[in-house]
Amino acid sequence: MSSGGLLLLLGLLTLWEVLTPVSSKDHPKFCELPADTGSCKGNVPRFYYNADHHQCLKFIYGGCGGNANNFKTIEECKSTCAA
């Protein structure tokens, strides 16, 4: 096999490893972050994944800032973090 073919194979294997979870309990690292209301004073109902309780919970988001553990729907939260 040529060196170009080996590099392509190595790249594909690396991509596959990154995209394939080890188990069904794996989730993105941001699912471990705490709920963060952000720096604004809004009153926006959102959901976050509570890693201690292994469930999606409602919180009030201020409308700006915060972190990635912030979902518009409970379904989006569950499919991202609790699947």
Swiss-Prot record:
User: Using the chain's own numbering, where are the disulfide bonds?
Assistant: 31-81, 40-64, 56-77
Q: Where is this site: Reactive bond for trypsin?
A: 41-42
Q: What is the superkingdom listed in this entry's lineage?
A: Eukaryota
State whether keyword Secreted applies. Answer: yes
- CDD domains on file: Kunitz_textilinin-like (cd22594)
PROSITE patterns on file: BPTI_KUNITZ_1, BPTI_KUNITZ_2
* SUPFAM superfamilies xref list: BPTI-like
Q: Name one GO cellular component term.
A: extracellular space
Span of domain BPTI/Kunitz inhibitor = 31-81
Check the record and name the Pfam families matching this protein. Kunitz_BPTI (PF00014)
Task: State the InterPro entries in the record.
Answer: Kunitz_BPTI, Kunitz_BPTI_sf, Prtase_inh_Kunz-CS, TFPI/VKTCI-like
Alphabetically list the UniProt keywords.
Disulfide bond, Protease inhibitor, Secreted, Serine protease inhibitor, Signal
Signal peptide range equals 1-24
Q: Which SMART domains match?
A: KU
A GO molecular-function descriptor = serine-type endopeptidase inhibitor activity
Expression by tissue: Expressed by the venom gland.
Q: Where in the cell is it found?
A: Secreted
Q: Which family does it belong to?
A: Belongs to the venom Kunitz-type family.
- What this chain does, per the record? Serine protease inhibitor. Does not inhibit plasmin, and does not reduce blood loss in the mouse tail vein blood loss model.
What is this protein called in UniProt? Answer: Kunitz-type serine protease inhibitor textilinin-4
Q: Which organism is it from?
A: Pseudonaja textilis textilis (Eastern brown snake)
Output the lineage of the source organism: Eukaryota, Metazoa, Chordata, Craniata, Vertebrata
